[in-house]
């Protein structure tokens, strides 16, 4: 399945501040699809929460995106939308920004993943 995904050229998308987006764009993440839609959104102080929400909804509907990276401070603004996304792909990863460090206690995706595994089961299976 991973090989098929790689052959299709699945993308990573980014919703973040300018520094975050520029960093990923310099790393080669930036793409514009055949419909001329980019796989990134630069959020600034003038960006409405509804714009972030709409962008996230567009990204989860695109079949060429497998991973959505979003600055955690913006994820907090649209938490209800992120929490309603339960499909395995695209995977949503919350990342820190230059001005806002990552806080694992706010990451609902991480909390959901932790709930899937019982640490005691892992220890019992190692024997």
UniProtKB/Swiss-Prot annotation:
Gene Ontology molecular function: any one: proton-transporting ATPase activity, rotational mechanism
SUPFAM superfamilies: AtpF-like
A Pfam family matched in the record: ATP-synt_F
Family stated for the protein in its record: Belongs to the V-ATPase F subunit family.
Alphabetically ordered keywords of this record: Hydrogen ion transport, Ion transport, Transport
Gene: Vha14
Organism expressing this protein natively: Anopheles gambiae
Name of the featured protein: V-type proton ATPase subunit F
GO cellular component: membrane; proton-transporting V-type ATPase, V1 domain
Job description of the protein: Subunit of the V1 complex of vacuolar(H+)-ATPase (V-ATPase), a multisubunit enzyme composed of a peripheral complex (V1) that hydrolyzes ATP and a membrane integral complex (V0) that translocates protons. V-ATPase is responsible for acidifying and maintaining the pH of intracellular compartments and in some cell types, is targeted to the plasma membrane, where it is responsible for acidifying the extracellular environment.
Binding partners and assembly: V-ATPase is a heteromultimeric enzyme made up of two complexes: the ATP-hydrolytic V1 complex and the proton translocation V0 complex. The V1 complex consists of three catalytic AB heterodimers that form a heterohexamer, three peripheral stalks each consisting of EG heterodimers, one central rotor including subunits D and F, and the regulatory subunits C and H. The proton translocation complex V0 consists of the proton transport subunit a, a ring of proteolipid subunits c9c'', rotary subunit d, subunits e and f, and the accessory subunits VhaAC45 and ATP6AP2.
Alphabetized InterPro entries for the sequence: ATPase_V1-cplx_f_g_su, ATPase_V1-cplx_fsu_euk, ATPase_V1_fsu_sf
Gene3D superfamilies reported in the protein's UniProt record: ATPase, V1 complex, subunit F
Domain of life of the source: Eukaryota
């Amino acid at each position: 399945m991973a090989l098929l995904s790689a052959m299709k050229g699945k993308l990573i998308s980014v919703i973040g501040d300018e520094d975050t987006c520029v960093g990923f764009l310099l790393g080669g993440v930036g793409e514009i699809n055949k419909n001329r839609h980019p796989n990134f959104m630069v959020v600034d102080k003038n960006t409405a929460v509804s714009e972030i929400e709409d962008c996230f909804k567009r990204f989860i509907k695109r079949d060429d995106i497998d991973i959505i990276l979003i600055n955690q401070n913006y994820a907090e603004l649209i938490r209800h939308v992120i929490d309603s996304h339960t499909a395995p792909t695209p995977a949503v990863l919350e990342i820190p920004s230059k001005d806002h460090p990552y806080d694992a206690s706010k990451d609902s995706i991480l909390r959901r993943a932790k709930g899937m595994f019982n640490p005691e089961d892992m220890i019992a299976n190692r024997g």
